[in-house]
Structures are given as C-alpha cells and as structure tokens.
Amino acid sequence: MTWIPLHCHSQYSILDATCSIKKFVAKAVEYHIPALALTDHGNLFGAVDFYKTCKQNAIKPIIGCELYVAPSSRFDKKKERKSQVANHLILLCKDEEGYRNLCLLSSLAYTEGFYYFPRIDRELLKQHSKGLICLSACLSGSIAQAALESEEALEKDLLWYQDLFQEDFFSEVQLHKSSEEKIALFEEEWLRQNYYQFIEKQLKVKDAVLTVSKRLGISSVATNDIHYLDPDDWLAHEILLNVQSREPIRTAKQNTYVPNPKRKTYPSREFYFKSPQEMAELFADHPETISNTLIVADRCNLELDFVTKHYPIYVPEDLQKKGSYSEEERYNASSAFLEQLCEQGLKTKYTPELLGHIAQKFPEKDPLTVVKERLSLESTIIISKGMCDYLLIVWDIINWAKDHGIPVGPGRGSGAGSVMLFLLGITEIEPIRFDLFFERFINPERLSYPDIDIDICMIGREKVINYAIERHGKENVAQIITFGTMKAKMAIKDVGRTLDTPLSKVNLIAKKIPDLNATIASALESDPDLRQLYIDDAEAAEIIDMAKKLEGSIRNTGVHAAGVIICGDPLTNHIPICVPKDSSMISTQYSMKPVESVGMLKVDFLGLKTLTSIHVATKAIYKKTGILLQAATLPLNDRNTFSLLHQGKTMGIFQMESRGMQELAKNLRPDAFEEIIAIGALYRPGPMDMIPSFINRKHGKENIEYDHPLMEPILKETFGIMVYQEQVMQIAGSLAKYSLGEGDVLRRAMGKKDHEQMVKEREKFCSRASANGIDPSIATTIFDKMEKFASYGFNKSHAAAYGLITYTTAYLKANYPKEWLAALLTCDYDDIEKVGKLIQEAHSMNIPVLPPDINESGQDFEATQEGIRFSLGAVKGVGVSIVDSIVEEREKNGPYRSLQDFVQRSDFKKVTKKQLESLVDAGSFNCFEPNKDLAIAILNDLYDTFSREKKEAATGVLTFFSLNSMTKDPVKVTISPENIVRRSDKELLKREKELLGVYLTAHPMDAVKHLLPFLSVVQSKDFEGLPHGSVVRTVFLIDKVTTKISSVEHKKFALLQVSDEEDSYELPIWSDMYAEYQDLLEEDRLIYAILTIDRRSDSLRLSCRWMRDLSSVNDTVITECDEVYDRLKNQKIYSSTKKSTGGQSQAMVKKEEPKAIPPVTISLDLNRLRHSHLFTLKGLIRKYSGSRALSLVFTKDNQRIASISPDSDFFVTEDISAFLQEIETTDIPARILATAV
C-alpha cells in the first residue's frame, strides 16, 4: 500500500530537524512515494527548493506549513509560558489561491503575531482558508489537546474546522510507538517514563479523534511528524535540539529517575521517515488513514510560476498627473520618457573631447552618429524586452542618490557596456571608447534580465534603501533572507559540547579540519591522523559521525548584505515574508536564488567604503581649492598618477593594496588607463600565469604573436594575450562571423563547461571559420585556446568601471596626498592596524601626522598646511557625541582659550572625567599644558568645581563659584606641579598608542637610537635594497603576536607584526625558533635580532634566525650575535633559482632531473580560491624551488575538478617543512594531502 507523508520537517525547521531537502526527496524516491509534503515550523523557507527538487525527481510536491495558532488573538502577547502561547496546525496548498493564502498567513504570523513564535489566529484562518487543506497536527495541536480534555471539547474543535474547511479538513493521527528492545536502550529511567506517558497520550488522542471524526463525517490521515531520515538519526537530532541551549545531554547523575529540565528531547525515537509498509503496519487497524493520504495528495495540484515577472512599474510624472491611463498608454509614456532622458544625456555627456576619442576608433564616421546608432540598437532591444521600467527604476534610485549628495559608483558588472546606462547616469564610463559591449549586458538572443548592481557610499546606503521603500511602498520592498549553516569545525564543537566530551579531545578533532570550508569527509580523506583517530577512539568516532550528520544544517537566519527585492505590488501576493531579528525592515522568506526564480526583481545596493573616502577627499579639496573633482571628468593621462604606480606606492589605492599588486604595478609600469583596466583583470586565477609575458611583451622583451592576423586588432591592446571575456566574443565574430549575441552564448557555454553545447559550438565555429577562409587546424587551435581561457576570463565592462575607481584613488593620492590620506584615515579609524599603515604611508611621503588638538581637530582627520591633523573621534574611548559637542561649542563661541575655558563651556551630561583624561593623554590639550599629568590634575579639579556649580545653579543655590562662573573670572587652581606624580616617557608613549592605535609623537626606539650604530643595525627602510641571501642585524618593536598551530606538524609558530621608526612588517617565527624564543614574544618589547633576506619570490621575505631582548644586550650578547652573524654569512642559506628571462623571473622553475622522491600534493578549494592566493602560492613555489615534484589538485564542492601533475613545472625543496609552514601563515585555501609528508 502507498502512503504519502503529509507532515514533514526539513532543516528549515531550524534546529529542530536534520533532513536536507535533497536527502529528504531522495528518501521518497527510494520508497517509490509519488508525492511528498513539506511542512516546516511556521515558515516556507524551503518551499521553492523543495518544489524544484521534487519536480526533478518526478515526485509531486505538496507545499505546506505547520503554523502556530494563538489560543486567542494573535495580538495577545501576555507573558505566558512558551508552551502555552500557540497550538500547531498543518495547512497544505491545493492550488495557486491556496499558495497565496499560505504566503499571507505565514507572513502575517511574523509581522503581526510574533510572540516566541510566528503566530496566526482563527480570525486570519477564516479570512484566508480558500485553496488550503487543513490537518489537525500533532499532540501540540488544539484538537489533540481538546481530545485529552473531553469528548465535548474535541467535537467542538472538530466542528469549527470542518465548518471552515469543509471536505478539505482532515483529522490527523500519529503513533510513535517503539519496540521494547528500543525502549530498553533509553539511557535514563526518566526518558523511559517520558516515552510511556507520551505514547499513552497518543493512543488516547488517536482513539478519540478517530471515533469522533467518524461520527462527524471527517476523514482522518496518518502521519509520522518526520524530523530526521533514518532510525539511528535520533541522537543527531537530539544534539541539534540542544545546540542553541548549549546543554549537555550526557551528564553523570546518581538518580536516573530525575529529569533534566534543561535537556531538550523528543519522547520517542520514531520521528524518522518511515516507509509506506511501516506506516501500514502501524495503522493496520485503520487502513483508511493510510489511503486517505492519497486523497489529500490528489487534491494538491499547485504549479509554481517561474515565468511571470512581478517587477515594479515606472509612471512618469506627466502621466501621474493625468490620473487614469491604460497599461499600454503607461508603457508608451515610460518608453518616451526613457528616450527623452537619453536625448538629454547625449547633449551633456558627449563632450567634444569624448567624441574625439570615439572618432579615433571610427575615423571614417561621424562620432555622434556612431553613438546614436549604438543607442538605437540598445533602445530597440530594451523596449522589445519590456525593460524600460527596470532601467527607469534603477535610474530613479541613482538619480535620487546623486541629487542628495550620496556618492554612487561609476558602474558594476556588465552594465558598463551600455551606452544607454551611460546616458542615464547609471554608469560613468563611456563604453564605445573602451570597446565594451552591450551584448555582454543584454544578449538579444537570450530571455533573461540582466542585473544592475549599485555601488553606494557606505554612509548613504541606508538612506538610498529608505528612499526605495518610500518610493515603492513598504509592503513592496524587502531584504533577502540568508541561512547560516553549520560548517565542519562548528559541527564538531557543537556535538562535542552537547555530548559532554572533554574540551581537549573536541579541540584535537576540530583542529584536524584544515579550514572553514573543508568538510569532515574531505578531512578524513586527506588526514591519516584523523582517520586513525576515528578508527582507534570510539568517542572521537561518535563525535565525527554525529557531526557528519549535522554538517550543513541551518543554524540561524540573517539578511543578504546587499540584495533588496522591489515588487510591483505587495510582496505577500507572491511570496512569504518575515521580520529579521533587530530589523525594522521586512525580509523575504526565500533566499536569493529562489526569490529571483519566482519573478522578483533583485537590486544589489552594495556599500563601498572607497566611494565614501573619495567623497570625503573631494569635499576637502573643494573646500580648500574650489575645484570640484569627479571621477567621470578626470584626465585619464595624468603623469603624476602613473608615476605613483611606477613606484609601487599603491597603499590606499582601490584594488591595488596587496603586495602582489604592488609588485605588478612596479614591473608593468602602466602608462595608459587601458593598462589599469588590464591589471584588474589579470590579477586573478588563470590569466595570472600570463602576467610575466604581459609585462615582457609591453616592454619589448618578448615577441607578440597572433594565431591569425584577424586577431591582432582584438588582442593588440593586451599584447596578444586574451584577458577579457569580450575578446572571446570579438574573436568569434571576426573569425567565424558570430553576432555579438552568439558570441555571448559561446562565452557562457565555455564558462559553464557545458560539454553538449560545446560540441555544437566547436563544429559551428570551425565550420564558419573555414567558410571565412581560415585553415581548419588554425581554427581548432584558436577554439581550444578560447575554451581554456573563457572559464576564467574577466568581464571587461566590470574591469573598466572598477578601473576608473582605481584610477580615481591613484589620482587623488598622487595629486592631493594629504586630503586623500586624511579621507582614508577618517573612513578607517575603527581599524587600528589600517590607521597605523596609513600613518606610515604618510610619513613615507613626508607628510607629518599631527596629534589631535582641541581647537583644530574634529570628527574627521583633516589635511592642514602642516600635514594631517589627527581626529578627535579616532581617540579610543571618546565617542561621536562628545566630539560633536566639543566642535559645536567651538564653532558657536570660538576657540577654547584655556583648560578652564574648555571645562567651563563643556556639557557635563556628555563629557566624563575619564574621557577628558583620554583627550589629554592623546595630546589634545598640549596647546594649553604640555605636561599631561599636570593637565589631568588641573582638568579634574576644574571638572569637580564646575560640575558642582552647575548642579547648585540648577537647584537655585547661588554660591561663590556660580558668581565666579557668571563673571567668567578665572578659578584659582590650587594644584602644585611639584606634587604631581609624573609618568615616565615610556608610560606616556604606551598610553598614546593605546588611545591612538599608533606611536604618533615618538617611537620607543627613539630611546635606543644612540645604541644602533654600535650594534651594526640595518633599518627596515634599507631592506629593499639588499640582495638575496643577505644577513642583517636589526632592532624592532613587537607590535602584535599571533600564535598558530601548523596543520602539518601540529607545532606552534608565531606571526609577528613588528616595526621600527620607518616601517612595519610581518615576521614569521617558525616552530623551531618559537620553542627557543617564545618567552621573548611579547607586545611592546624591543628586540635585537638577526634576519635573512629572501628574494626568490616576487617580493622580499624575511626570516628570523636569532633574537634577544634589547634591554639585556651587553658585550657577551653582542659577541654571541657576531658569531651567529658570521656563521650565517658563511652558509649558503638560500639556493639561487632565477633564470635570465629578459630581467623578469620565470613564472615557475623547472629542474631537469628531479630526484626519485615522493611528490608533494596540495589540494586547492576553488570555492574560496582568489587571484591573490595563486599569486602568493606561485611566489612560495619560486622561493622554495628545488628538486621535489609538486602536484596541485583543484577541487570544488569536494569534487576533483582539475590537477597539475608532478611532471609539470612545479618543484620544491626536498625538505618541505619550511614551505608547508609558510603556506600555513597565509589564507590560501590549501590542504596538504597525505603524499606531502
């Protein structure tokens, strides 16, 4: 007999069910069940995913929900016990009307009825019952509760629901009975008693409900309230229940009859996905309860609509004034308004200078005609696809932001390829000039809508979203929900804690998980020690087994960082919504992909801090010079800008701050904006391997070759190297006569590695190329290169738009360095490490950073004639409101004249003594009293005097002090400087660093400057000029110590952030050194050390070979240092690995005859691999080049995607420990496989 599960929970019943949608549906397939319901607690989070997965497996999906029903009104939120605030009820969708009603009920449960749970009430049920089938739910349902109370109460409840839902109401019966053998396995007696009481209730409810339902003509169905898949999943489920409460479920107790009130547990262990046969046996005395589930399934025929768009519409103002209009009239008016905006843009955007650039591209045509032809093409496609409203809505939002002084980025993604978007001001980079294609944005040969993402100043982002809400209606706009899942490490820790396992053992297992995104299965596969632990230790094996079951479970909800949904009518007409914790804005119940698939418009409002920095800087520049700088109108050939990049001074330049980018800028020496675009596209996995060739070709050190002459005009800009996806489209068009739309289809197929489509495209390309007179073998070669490249090629439109931001930041730094660095410091003053680096950058540019001053500093860092003035707001412990109060008073009544004047004019409700002391120690009152200890004593005395006086004045008591204040006469300070306990310079300097995050007015090394010549010290500023293999003595201050454990050797090592007066740098202390010197590794300690210089990679790397506390240095220590120094100088510390390649290092170094030793194998996770990771790894391989073969394995979602075998060009040193240790210090998503050791 077939049975349909109608009461089922997935992991979207958060922390209450372990079933993933995929495994849940697979179980139904295994049991040959034709239909399946999903009824998660109070939400529809998983509905779309469930629906699609069922359809893919030829199973009828039944979308439902186990709702919480308030016992009285949903608005009644009295402080009752959690168990008494709601009853359960199952609703299942029959059709589209039922789906809309269920969406609305689930939404209102959150927006109106939330109290412990999202709750509806009977009033809402009456209003929205159409199209729904109702089941009476479990023991927590009101009908089950009535059955336990009396037959009269039961009959009354059944009749109420029967009257409302008619034949679509079914009473529900459940029985979670276990065998005596299973009951005997319960660990504690109270659990057994709990089970017996539960079964007694279930039997009583079952009998009563079946009896009364039969008398009333109500059909009954049997369900099993599924919360996990298999019988042995009960323990994993119980662990999940207790994750949030952090309550151990295993504790040693003397009396097993006493329940643990904190432990969450289900009374039976039968809440698994039972087979139809098991259910038929369980309800053999009432077989109709099984067959009735088929009747329910037969009535549920909901088909979700994935075609219709529910996008908002745009109504021009002229039409709004008219009042009534047809949809055709509205759309025509919108199209006309769009064309009008474009006409205005043609007049204002296309300056003679810009038209001159286009004329260079098309010398035989009038440039304005070129623009208008492109616009006509775009307009035709946009209007035919019904996209006018979409573009106007985005234009309206961006236009409002700009009108209100909120900076918006120059574009993002493929939208920068559209002339229309440029004319509308949605983007700020002209696409024809830079060979950007509209077809990359909207392909006329595809139906899908494009995304237009908006970069917005961080500060103004919330205002822009609020405008969208106000413009389109609060009920039409929502954030997008996200789901936080249990990663492997977290699952192991949660399971270990819940099973009350010793923390040491839990940590031992967790540390075997190499990174945040590794799975337990992959860790077991790659780590032999973990496998052995699993085999040898039963307790560890149980933790691992349970964690594997819970890995990937949803742990919490959040909201998407950028995505906002805008609908043309109330969202609840189409999707369910909820209210996120600590948010006033509603959120969708569907995550990003599902919500877009059901026709919702997603707009990404991405907060970009760089735009805020640009805004702050340009405001300061305008205030100082009267010049209003805008990214769109900057000269793109500024000599200062390119000179700055040639020097590699990329700190504070958008997308170019990493060490790898710094080296790339220095080596490439870009001298055109197009090369800045290329830099952003090259520094990524794939094309990164071509960086040396790109550099050499630019500088004439490598020949530029083309597979066919037709490719030269396409690839000339990038020196014969494919860098952009658009170049694939161009090559297909030039060689094989593809339209740009067809070229985009080809690009997508290549990128997705769609084998079936690629077979067709290869034949099409080669055939058309042959017809165009191209040799078939050449065509095949070119197609192969295109196919290899397209999987990692970059979107040129995006690279160009972001390249403009890069150029703008470089321009500001090169031409207005004080204003730019002040803006960066203002926007990053919460990041102490970043502030320190920026101040060092200012010093390297000979720009003094001045301490805060009570009369000159404000909320922001400010560029002054002398340098950059430190912000009062950046002083630790001094809040925004205090600084605002200080500045407001200063602007209103003039500068503060003295300590007394400052205190007298202070708002005592906002300023505290502790904050005054912080301001003093930061240097803010040096203008009045440079002795900080004396200044604090005076301020405290004045503070007590004036705060007392103000209190007395408020009570109407007139004293000498209040008279004194009223006449502004000086208060006599009785503090004698001789009686003040003065702190040492070292203490004051340490306090300054605590408050400012940096040593600003001095450095601890100042005190030992006189010693440095006698210690033969080399300072950090001189490291860059030293050759490979140099040995240096140096002195540094330890700023930060980060201790780590190697996943290979499981030994401690440290990463030090150290500094001297000139610079800061990172210094690794490997495990052998760490064991010897760990007692010295303390912050704020001055160290005398010997370092070695390694230049085998693209950047300078340092290793520490010896160290001592500087305070302990004496003749003996100096002698010891000299001996170590001489020994290292006479050793060949590093082997030279450079080959002559026209002055450039080879990408990889190949040894001709590697020794027969096992290869090192490294697995790289493509889900998290970034271009910077490969660049760093490449440098490490060069650094540790040797004779031992290295294999790279690339994985995605734990599946092996590709590999580079040991017979490739990758070789490292035989002793790989240092190589592996250095990988540990990076964030490369790498795992060292078993063959590595």
Curated annotation (Swiss-Prot):
Encoding gene (name): dnaE
Biological function: DNA polymerase III is a complex, multichain enzyme responsible for most of the replicative synthesis in bacteria. This DNA polymerase also exhibits 3' to 5' exonuclease activity. The alpha chain is the DNA polymerase.
Family affiliation: Belongs to the DNA polymerase type-C family. DnaE subfamily.
Cellular component terms (Gene Ontology): cytoplasm
SMART domains tied to this protein: POLIIIAc
Superkingdom classification of source: Bacteria
Subcellular location: Cytoplasm
Protein name: DNA polymerase III subunit alpha
One Gene Ontology MF term: 3'-5' exonuclease activity
SUPFAM superfamilies from the UniProt entry: PHP domain-like, RuvA domain 2-like
Catalytic activity: DNA(n) + a 2'-deoxyribonucleoside 5'-triphosphate = DNA(n+1) + diphosphate
Any GO BP: DNA replication
Species in which this protein is naturally found: Chlamydia muridarum (strain MoPn / Nigg)
Subunit structure: DNA polymerase III contains a core (composed of alpha, epsilon and theta chains) that associates with a tau subunit. This core dimerizes to form the PolIII' complex. PolIII' associates with the gamma complex (composed of gamma, delta, delta', psi and chi chains) and with the beta chain to form the complete DNA polymerase III complex.
A matching Pfam family: PHP
InterPro entries tied to this protein: DNA_pol3_alpha_NTPase_dom, DNA_pol3_alpha_thumb_dom, DNA_pol3_finger, DnaE2/DnaE/PolC, DNAPol_HHH, PHP_dom, Pol/His_phosphatase_N, Pol/histidinol_Pase-like
